[in-house]
């Protein structure tokens, strides 16, 4: 189908001409409970709509007498999030047969397709960018984004003949399931790589990573067990003065700039200080930084190495601690050591909570036990860890690129479906199923006649 031209037998029509919108159940907060009880029905809310399906792990239940018959979800219904504080949530949909009787709340609505419209076709349309983009432009509100019932008069949908609707829905079911399966496999890889990196760090500090390397060394290499304090020339807290965001003074790292194995020199504020304070707290290449305090346990005591200074004068705050080492220890190796699982566990065991903040003292950091091989082996460990991490980073980048392509593939397939490209051959083989009485135009006339006979669309809405 060329741009702007519909396939033979198709028509464009507002969603409201082929579906009826049913509004959700209104109830008071005290009328809802979080467990099943006699004469109560489970209620779908916007948070239960996830990836086109229903997540029923967090349902509420309301008295059955609040629920009209038309507000009970049928297998053909497409449940829509009608209101939300998040624009991305408004309009999201779910279409799934539930094995129990269920209704939906006032912040949701149901698109109930007419009998001559295949529900799976409408459900797939609500996943498409055609629908999502229009919903985004129509939803509005001061604090809450809403779709009004009249919005569905303004959202156009390409309508094929009924037989073709079913074929399109079946093809999309198959193709999108394959896409989802591929996506799920890709999404597992970052966790696999995370475990791989942790295994590398563990092997680096227990000697396994360089076990074979040691066999070729003239002198047997031994890992010494010693307190961190014994290889320190300095352990100093940062500046306690309040920084500014206006760019006045010298750059100073934020607490969040230090993560395990990384220092982000772009994560900064600014601080005016005296010359003596600058000289005492100015960072240099090879400095190790530890987080002294953080609201999250996983970030307390993490160690990052300043590998290449990007600022002429860079300071650090009092919630970070700077460590400088003797010549017996490479800072790159010590960063690896304190990022390893065993060292992180030991560090977290020393964490104390004060006024909601989790922290560790300089004394506790000094007392940490370090496994230290000779400098030559430290250098070999650093080389191997960097090599393996670079390998993992390359894979992760490739996976992220592939995931982006897979995510785009879903919308590409949906776009082709609603342009008629997935069923071009089927139409050529079945001309009788797309023309005359079987055309979409004839189908819409039948729907129009049935609505007129039953009192029209507005009457249907009032009955809900």
Swiss-Prot record:
- Where, if anywhere, are coiled coils annotated? none
Keyword annotations: DNA-binding, Restriction system
| One BP term from GO | DNA restriction-modification system
Q: Does the keyword DNA-binding apply?
A: yes
Extract one GO cellular component term from the record: type I site-specific deoxyribonuclease complex
Highest rank taxon of the organism: Bacteria
One MF annotation (Gene Ontology) recorded for this entry: DNA binding
Q: What induces it?
A: Encoded in the hsd locus, in the order hsdR-hsdM-hsdS. There is a promoter upstream of hsdR and another between hsdR and hsdM. This probably allows expression of the methylase enzyme before the restriction-specific subunit.
List the InterPro entries hit by this protein, alphabetically.
Answer: Restrct_endonuc_typeI_TRD, Restrct_endonuc_typeI_TRD_sf, Type-I_RE_S_subunit
Pfam families, sorted? Methylase_S
- Please tell me what else the database record remarks about this protein: Type I restriction and modification enzymes are complex, multifunctional systems which require ATP, S-adenosyl methionine and Mg(2+) as cofactors and, in addition to their endonucleolytic and methylase activities, are potent DNA-dependent ATPases.
According to the record's subunit comment, the protein's assembly and interactions are:
The type I restriction/modification system is composed of three polypeptides R, M and S. The restriction enzyme has stoichiometry R(2)M(2)S(1). The methyltransferase is composed of M(2)S(1).
**In which family does this protein belong, per the annotation?**
Belongs to the type-I restriction system S methylase family.
Q: Which NCBIfam families match?
A: PRK09737.1
Query: What's the domain remark here?
Result: Contains two DNA recognition domains, each specifying recognition of one of the two defined components of the target sequence.
Q: What does this protein do?
A: The specificity (S) subunit of a type I restriction enzyme; this subunit dictates DNA sequence specificity. In the presence of the R subunit the complex can also act as an endonuclease, binding to the same target sequence but cutting the DNA some distance from this site. Whether the DNA is cut or modified depends on the methylation state of the target sequence. When the target site is unmodified, the DNA is cut.
What this protein is called in its record is: Type I restriction enzyme EcoKI specificity subunit
Annotated source species: Escherichia coli (strain K12)
Q: Which gene encodes it?
A: hsdS
């Amino acid at each position: 189908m060329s741009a702007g031209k519909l396939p033979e037998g198709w028509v464009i029509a507002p969603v409201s001409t082929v579906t009826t919108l049913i509004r959700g159940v209104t109830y008071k907060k005290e009328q809802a409970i979080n467990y099943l009880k006699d004469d109560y029905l489970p209620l779908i809310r916007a948070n239960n709509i996830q990836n086109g399906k229903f997540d029923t792990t967090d349902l509420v239940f309301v008295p059955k007498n609040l629920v009209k018959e038309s507000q009970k979800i049928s297998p053909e219904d497409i449940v829509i999030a009608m209101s939300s504080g998040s624009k991305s949530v408004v309009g999201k949909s779910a279409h799934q047969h539930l094995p129990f009787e269920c209704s939906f709340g006032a912040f949701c609505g149901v698109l109930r397709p007419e009998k001559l419209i295949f529900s799976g076709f409408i459900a797939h349309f609500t996943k498409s960018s055609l629908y999502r983009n229009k919903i985004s432009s129509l939803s509005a509100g001061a604090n809450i984004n809403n779709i009004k019932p009249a919005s569905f008069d303004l959202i156009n949908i390409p309508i094929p003949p009924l037989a073709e609707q079913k074929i399109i829905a079946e093809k999309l079911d198959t193709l999108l399931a394959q896409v989802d399966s591929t996506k799920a496999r890709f999404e597992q890889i970052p966790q696999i790589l995370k475990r791989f990196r942790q295994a590398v760090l563990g092997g680096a500090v227990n000697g396994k990573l360089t076990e074979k390397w040691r066999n070729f060394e003239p002198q047997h290499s031994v890992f010494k067990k010693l307190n961190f304090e014994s290889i320190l020339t300095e352990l100093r807290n940062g500046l306690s003065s309040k920084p500014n965001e206006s760019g006045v003074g010298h750059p100073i790292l934020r607490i969040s700039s230090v993560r395990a194995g990384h220092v982000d020199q772009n994560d900064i504020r600014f601080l005016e200080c005296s010359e003596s304070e600058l000289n005492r707290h100015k960072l240099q290449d090879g400095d190790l930084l530890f987080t002294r305090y953080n609201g999250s346990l996983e970030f307390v005591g993490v160690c990052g190495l300043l590998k290449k200074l990007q600022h002429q004068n860079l300071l650090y705050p009092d919630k970070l601690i700077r460590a400088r080492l003797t010549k017996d220890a490479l800072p790159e190796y010590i960063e690896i050591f304190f990022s390893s699982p065993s060292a992180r566990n030991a560090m977290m065991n020393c964490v104390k909570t004060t006024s909601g903040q989790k922290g560790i003292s300089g004394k506790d950091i000094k007392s940490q036990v370090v496994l230290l091989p000779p400098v030559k082996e430290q250098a070999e460990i650093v080389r191997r860890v960097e090599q393996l991490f670079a390998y993992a980073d390359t894979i992760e980048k490739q996976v992220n690129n592939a995931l982006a392509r897979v995510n785009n593939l879903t919308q590409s397939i949906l776009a082709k479906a609603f342009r008629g490209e997935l069923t071009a051959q089927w139409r050529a083989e079945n001309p009788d199923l797309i023309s005359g009485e079987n055309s979409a135009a004839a189908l819409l006339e039948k729907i129009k006649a049935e609505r007129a006979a039953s009192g029209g669309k507005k009457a249907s809405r009032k009955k809900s």
